[in-house]
């Protein structure tokens, strides 16, 4: 068995491509091995795939030296034209013998094919040298790799995320010769970063030699090993000055992707900058300089220190002079950025909130949707309506402000007035920070700066928090953050409804993978809040309210737009349900109903169906539902029935049973008590079966037939309040 080493060296790769390379290369190389070498590596025991910011590496051990010999059957001409009348070979057979260099024509035999019998001959195909196969196929393997973005850098028809500078390819220590573009494979690797590119090539003998030389240079090939090393060094260096660092997986993963020789360097900045909001300081350090801010271990207060990760060749010895030079350089660059942030912050706080609100009149939300000021005006009407729909009962209103006791009517009215004032103030300030200098320069801080400035300008904590949280849900350090209270909820829900419905009006909902205006994300966030906070609200009511109050000057096909909106919401909802591991049939039985409306209610139904699908009553209801559906399937939507025509005892029994469950079901539906609803609906099973056993539905008399179908359709419609049982699979 042999070994194969491939290293593709390039310019600095985008960090997001580094972690994606190993699985892509693994898939491509495994396919090649299976197809060309008959060498399967399903368990990944022989091949290893690595990547850093400058190199992509494939190491294969226990690889076959050559492919095995194979027996192959060669099909010749039809047997009927192979021989002359005297039995001697005819011209077609002679040509077949010459073409395949057959020495002994007695080994030719007949084989049956679809079109008759043919001459055939078995031969041995000699195995090929694996090195030769590799040299022929490696360029194609590289070319098949998929990237988010790639580039041309020579006249050759090749693409790669960055220009390829060298290719190392060895099979048992020998060069596997091939060209990729204008780069020729050899036995050299570029390791050191101290010298010029041309002077720092190192000759490689084999895999062990390669690994040893990388290790000596401090290069960590494995992404996970590099990540663990960086995290460990961050913790140790922070401890030295009694600090901790904020665990930011996104930043760490980015650092892993841009380094191969990670080296930790501490730095510090002037304490005068600590008056700047710490969120702004942290953003400048993390997003713009890729530094890790440090916090006091005892109280988590931001300290004037940071840690940077340099990508330098290590001599495995501590070089204090070098580290000091790097640290001073880091501090100098950071100081320039912090001076900018300090200037923007000081300019902002000279103004008032009203100044920034007025400036939103000049910021366009989107062409055809007005400015952010106009968006805010829409939200001022929409938010109270949503609040009333969600918290319209006394119990909900009293929970909106926990300090208010609503035992009597006057206190309830007082609570409502206070809630509405808070909502109005929250909505008025949601977008003011978009016009600040800081958010203009650091757009990632929208909402965060709004909260900070609102507090500074004397707004209540509830209002300030809602400004930040109306952008929620959002991920932070691997955790999903939701609004903390109902005012944040209403602010987020209202803003997202307005965004989605505005783009519905423009007929600009995202298609395919593209979502440039984050409409899909807004709908998903809206659904997640409704599910997390257990809010029931009618999508149809929101749509109707919205277009009855806004965009009335436009000629709109509201029926079509509503269908588009409901389908868009339903698709996002179904995807979320799938991510929660509900079965597709369970989801479809609820979400595919034409009356799909309330997100949280639909979730409760799906959850109930999932947990009770195997219940005996659900079996019975499914059987009855499908029986009803089979009879009425082609009858249209008739739901009217004439009681005077339905006089058979089975019909009378079924009508009474239907009217009983219809009258009783409303209270269980209102309480979302689907277990009792199932028990109630089960009472219709026996009457339906008795009806089908004794009554013919499709009789010749049209009025009688339609009345019976109308009764059955009415029962189907009632049962759909639980789910569409016909969608369930057993």
Report the location of each language-model feature.
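Amphipathic alpha-helical "coupling" segments that flank catalytic cores
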Residues: 1-397, 405-730
């Amino acid at each position: 068995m042999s070994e194969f080493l491939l290293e593709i060296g390039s310019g600095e790769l985008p960090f997001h491509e580094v972690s994606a390379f190993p699985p892509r290369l693994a898939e491509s190389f495994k396919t090649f091995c299976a197809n060309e070498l008959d060498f399967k590596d399903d368990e990944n025991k022989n091949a290893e795939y690595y990547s850093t910011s400058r190199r992509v590496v494939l190491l294969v051990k226990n690889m076959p030296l050559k492919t095995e010999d194979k027996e192959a059957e060669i099909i010749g001409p039809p047997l009927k034209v192979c021989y002359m009348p005297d039995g001697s070979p005819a011209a077609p057979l002679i040509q077949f013998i010459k073409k395949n260099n057959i020495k002994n024509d007695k080994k030719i035999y007949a084989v049956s094919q679809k079109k008759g019998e043919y001459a055939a001959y078995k031969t041995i195909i000699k195995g090929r040298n694996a090195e030769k196969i590799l040299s022929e196929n490696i360029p194609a393997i590289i070319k098949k790799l998929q990237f988010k973005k790639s580039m041309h850098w020579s006249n050759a028809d090749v693409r790669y995320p960055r220009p390829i500078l060298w290719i190392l390819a060895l099979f048992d220590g020998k060069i596997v010769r091939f060209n990729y573009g204008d780069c020729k494979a050899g036995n050299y690797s570029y390791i050191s970063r101290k010298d010029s590119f041309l002077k720092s090539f190192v000759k490689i003998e084999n895999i062990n030699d390669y690994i040893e030389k990388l290790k000596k240079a401090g290069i960590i090939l494995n992404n996970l090993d590099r990540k663990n090393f960086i995290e460990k060094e961050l913790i140790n260096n922070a401890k030295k000055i009694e600090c901790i660092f904020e665990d930011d997986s996104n930043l760490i993963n980015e650092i892993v992707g841009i380094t191969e020789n990670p080296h930790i360097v501490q730095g510090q900045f002037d304490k005068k900058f600590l008056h700047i909001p710490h969120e702004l300081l942290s953003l400048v350090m993390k997003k713009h300089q890729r530094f890790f801010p440090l916090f006091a271990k005892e109280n988590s207060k931001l300290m004037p220190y940071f840690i940077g990760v340099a990508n330098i060749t290590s001599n495995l010895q501590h070089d204090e002079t070098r580290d000091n030079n790097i640290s001073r350089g880091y501090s100098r660059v950071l100081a320039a950025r912090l001076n900018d942030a300090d200037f923007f912050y000081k300019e902002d706080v000279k103004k008032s909130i009203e100044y920034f609100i007025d400036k939103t009149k000049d910021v366009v939300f989107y062409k055809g949707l007005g400015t952010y000021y106009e968006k805010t005006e829409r939200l001022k009407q929409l938010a109270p309506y949503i609040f009333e729909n969600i918290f319209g009962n006394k119990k909900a209103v009293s929970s909106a402000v926990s300090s208010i006791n609503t035992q009597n009517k006057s206190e309830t009215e007082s609570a409502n007035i206070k809630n509405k004032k808070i909502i109005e103030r929250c909505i008025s300030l949601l977008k003011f920070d978009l016009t600040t200098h800081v958010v203009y320069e650091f757009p990632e801080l929208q909402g965060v700066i709004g909260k900070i400035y609102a507090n500074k300008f004397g707004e209540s904590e509830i209002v300030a928090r809602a400004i930040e949280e109306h952008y929620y849900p959002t991920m932070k350090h691997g955790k999903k953050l939701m609004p903390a209270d109902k005012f944040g909820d209403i602010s987020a829900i209202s803003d997202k409804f307005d965004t989605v419905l505005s783009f519905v009006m423009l007929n600009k909902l995202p298609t395919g993978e593209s979502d440039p205006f984050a409409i899909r994300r807004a709908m998903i966030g809206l659904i997640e809040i409704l599910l997390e906070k257990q809010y029931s609200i009618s999508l149809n009511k929101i749509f109707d309210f919205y277009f009855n109050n806004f965009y009335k000057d436009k000629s709109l096909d509201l029926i079509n737009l509503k269908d588009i909106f409901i389908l868009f919401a339903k698709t996002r909802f179904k995807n979320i349900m799938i991510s929660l591991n509900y079965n597709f049939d369970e989801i479809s039985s609820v979400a595919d109903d034409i009356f799909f409306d309330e997100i949280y209610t639909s979730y409760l139904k799906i959850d109930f169906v999932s947990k009770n699908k195997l219940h005996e009553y659900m079996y019975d209801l499914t059987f009855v539902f499908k029986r009803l559906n089979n009879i009425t399937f082609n009858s249209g939507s008739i739901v009217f029935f004439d009681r005077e025509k339905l006089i058979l005892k089975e019909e009378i029994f079924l009508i009474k049973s239907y009217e009983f469950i219809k009258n009783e079901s409303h209270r269980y539906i209102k309480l979302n008590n689907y277990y009792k609803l199932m028990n109630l609906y089960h009472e219709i099973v026996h009457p339906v079966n008795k009806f089908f056993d004794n009554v013919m539905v499709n009789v010749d008399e049209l009025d009688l037939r339609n009345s019976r179908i109308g009764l059955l359709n009415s029962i189907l419609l009632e049962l759909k309040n639980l789910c569409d049982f016909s969608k369930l699979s057993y």
